[in-house]
Amino acid sequence: MKAGALELGEGSKTSIPRGGVNRGISILDFILRLITIIGTLGSAIAMGTTNETLPFFTQFTQFRAEYDDLPTFTFFVIANSIVSGYLVLSLPMSILHIVRSGARASRIVLIFFDTAMLALLTAAASAASAIVYLAHKGNAQANWFAICQQFKSFCERISGSLIGSFGGIILFILLVLLSAVALSRC
């Protein structure tokens, strides 16, 4: 083949059919949704079951830390639960995209709701990470002391639940990008 033939667009005429690529994208979309369910549901369960009681107490006070002591953590649990529920409900639509890779309208709906759930998850994880930072470091100017020196198990669990949630955010970004690529190829 001459170099001039390539410049004229007479190169290899073989190409991958669009349906096959879209089917591969749809399978990857389904797998990413399953992994995201595990991350967000795990984060909600880890945060929702977090509590610790210190072994010492005064005559009137027992020192205890629970996730529902702070409204931000409650919002975090609710948001992760909503996102997990949405992901479970979106699995049939993802299966539909594997079977019918040219389904355009349902992909648009998924992009819209995936973006909304991404925003909700980002808001919850960001708010919770600010409180986790205060729990670890405190704020001397506001007279807020770090509690993680006393409540070690509590702080380890709330920090771990943030990891799953931020992993879910990254996977949601990939889901939106994959849906956009699949939509552009329809």
UniProtKB/Swiss-Prot annotation:
Subcellular location: Cell membrane
Transmembrane parts of this sequence: 27-47, 75-95, 108-128, 162-182
UniProt topological domain (Cytoplasmic) ranges: 1-26, 96-107, 183-186
Gene Ontology biological process terms in this record: cell wall modification; cell-cell junction assembly
Glycan attachment points: N51
GO cellular component terms attached to this protein's record: plasma membrane
Stretches of the chain found on the membrane's Extracellular side: 48-74, 129-161
Free-text function comment from the UniProt entry: Regulates membrane-cell wall junctions and localized cell wall deposition. Required for establishment of the Casparian strip membrane domain (CSD) and the subsequent formation of Casparian strips, a cell wall modification of the root endodermis that determines an apoplastic barrier between the intraorganismal apoplasm and the extraorganismal apoplasm and prevents lateral diffusion.
Protein family: Belongs to the Casparian strip membrane proteins (CASP) family.
Subunit structure: Homodimer and heterodimers.
Protein name per UniProt: Casparian strip membrane protein 3
